[in-house]
Amino acid sequence: MTASPKNEMWTVFKRLMGYLKPMKGMFLLSVVGLIVYGLVDAAFISFIGPFIDKGFSSSAPAISNGIALPTSQGFHADNQVLLMAPIVVILMFSLRGFANFVSTYGISYMSARLIMDMRQQVFEHYLSLPVSYMDKENTGNLISKVTFDTEQIARASGSALISIVRDSVTIIGMLGLMFYNSWKLSLCILVIGPIMGVVITIVSRRFRKVSKQIQTAMGDVSAATEQMIKGHKNVLAFGGQETETARFAKINDRNRHQNMKLAVAQAVSQPLIMVIGSFALAFVLYAASLDSMKADLTAGTFATILGAMMAMLQPIKNLTRVNAEFQRGIAACTTVFELLDTVPESDTGTYTVARAKGNLRFDNVSFSYEGQERRALEKIDFEVSQGQTLALVGRSGSGKSTIASLVTRFYTGLESGDILLDDVSIYDYSLKSLRSQVALVSQQVTLFNDTIANNIAYAYPGEVTREQIIEAATLAHAMEFIEQLPDGLDTQVGENGVLLSGGQRQRIAIARAMLRDAPVLILDEATSALDTESEKAIQQGLDNLRQNRTSVVIAHRLSTIESADQILVVDQGRIVERGTHKSLLELGGMYAKLYQMQFGS
């Protein structure tokens, strides 16, 4: 049974309030400031009645030196009340200003802290999610949750706290003031209350629905922008400016349309609340004109009630306006909490080892990706011992990279079989321990917007010296181009290494793997971006790296794996051939055909 929208909203709100627990002192201080602010407003209105009734009275003429002074209005002034009035006003508004400062500072502090904490939690949760989740999610939506959604939540939280506390206290104070002065007249306004409640409930549902659509639309805008920026060169090369412009215009207009839906709902709700409030005010004015009411009213009392009613209109309007903001925040909260509730990567293994020997075995492994009926791997069975090199070759999409991804548990859920490292199932290892045994160089190199040295030393377990970085870069034949750069190892590579060539990026990635010095090495098309000269130069370094390490090499260029101890030919998820380079050529099967296609007869 699904929760009602109202119950769901309060569940989300209570969960959001949990983020304020570490700041409960600041929260209480802000609430006190807001309460004082609202009470001062009510106190100021309550001052109107005595000021009129006692400050100005028609009960007796004004007296000066024992002589009655006629006035055109028939009132005389109580000088003591009139003299006290300015002092009271100054004190009230000074207190109100101080309370406003305290509450504003406190809410700003909590909002900034809330944004920081939620962003940190979302970012850390991204790092704990499986690769399969990232494969199917829209990158723009993921980024939007960190940037846009968290801002919406903080803004809504601050606005909601201000209105819910300050404006509610003001309204309650004004109602109390009205009932204290004339409960009969004040009952008139309660007739309108339920009608306002129904209107606000209906509008709230509309706000929440449209706000969720806005979150999605903003994610689409982020995704389209990111896609264009990443593919900027291709867009220019293929003359796709008009295509991208039209695509973004469509997405952008959809976002505008969703925002206009919210604006219309907000524009309709506020005047509607005001019109309903005007009926209440008109009803009070009518009731005050009745003879039965006049007997109990003084000029000051009526002015107080009227002033209280007028003073309530703006807080009611604020509550209606903040309702739209609040619903946007709840919608953003819902999407963020759905993300945070996503099950992180499974890490139930407890086995740890400082350094594995590197004996790797696939035991009759079958695997299919989530949502795919066809198996990506079918009964894969092989063993590679410490210090040996296993090469995987085959057509694109045959399953080579899937085998490599399973070793690091990027994907889980084998349909049959097991994968063992040193005769221990990789699923018995803790993720941290397992992945510390593996160094990976893929065909899609990821470099961070930092120096070359820091990219080579990325995530190195422990302190790393400059000499170690230089040694790794030298073995990867990266120092050849690094020494020619103005800042050498301290050269900034730009976002994802955009300031370097493809071959240079690949060699930095290889140097990173060399520095890691893991017992298992996975090279997924590691030399694909290198020219022939660079490829030959780096082979000696790779041969040195492979010594006493288990190496799994996925290669398109067959010249790079001729020295492999074992070569597996993979086709449609199955191993169709296995052997050494020489034996497979003699076999005259698929490997021989692939070799012939690259090098001729």
UniProtKB/Swiss-Prot annotation:
InterPro entries: AAA+_ATPase (IPR003593), ABC1_TM_dom (IPR011527), ABC1_TM_sf (IPR036640), ABC_transporter-like_ATP-bd (IPR003439), ABC_transporter-like_CS (IPR017871), ABC_transpr_lipidA (IPR011917), P-loop_NTPase (IPR027417), Type_1_exporter (IPR039421)
Family statement: Belongs to the ABC transporter superfamily. Lipid exporter (TC 3.A.1.106) family.
Protein name according to UniProt: ATP-dependent lipid A-core flippase
Notes on the domains: In MsbA the ATP-binding domain (NBD) and the transmembrane domain (TMD) are fused.
Enzyme class of the recorded protein, top EC level: translocase
Segments crossing the lipid bilayer: 32-52, 81-101, 160-180, 183-203, 267-287, 296-316
Domain of life per record: Bacteria
Every ABC transporter domain range: 360-597
Entry GO MF terms: ABC-type transporter activity; ATP binding; ATP hydrolysis activity; ATPase-coupled lipid transmembrane transporter activity
Catalyzed reactions: ATP + H2O + lipid A-core oligosaccharideSide 1 = ADP + phosphate + lipid A-core oligosaccharideSide 2
Keywords, sorted A to Z: ATP-binding, Cell inner membrane, Cell membrane, Lipid transport, Membrane, Nucleotide-binding, Translocase, Transmembrane, Transmembrane helix, Transport
Functional description taken from the UniProt entry: Involved in lipopolysaccharide (LPS) biosynthesis. Translocates lipid A-core from the inner to the outer leaflet of the inner membrane. Transmembrane domains (TMD) form a pore in the inner membrane and the ATP-binding domain (NBD) is responsible for energy generation.
Compartments where located: Cell inner membrane
Lineage of the organism: Bacteria, Pseudomonadati, Pseudomonadota, Gammaproteobacteria, Alteromonadales
Subunit structure as annotated in this protein's UniProt entry: Homodimer.
Membrane topology: Multi-pass membrane protein
Any matching Pfam family: ABC_tran
Gene this protein is translated from: msbA
EC number: 7.5.2.6
SMART domains, A to Z: AAA
Binding-site residues for ATP, renumbered to this chain: G394, R395, S396, G397, S398, G399, K400, S401
CDD domains assigned: ABC_6TM_MsbA_like (cd18552)
Residues annotated as domain ABC transmembrane type-1: 28-328
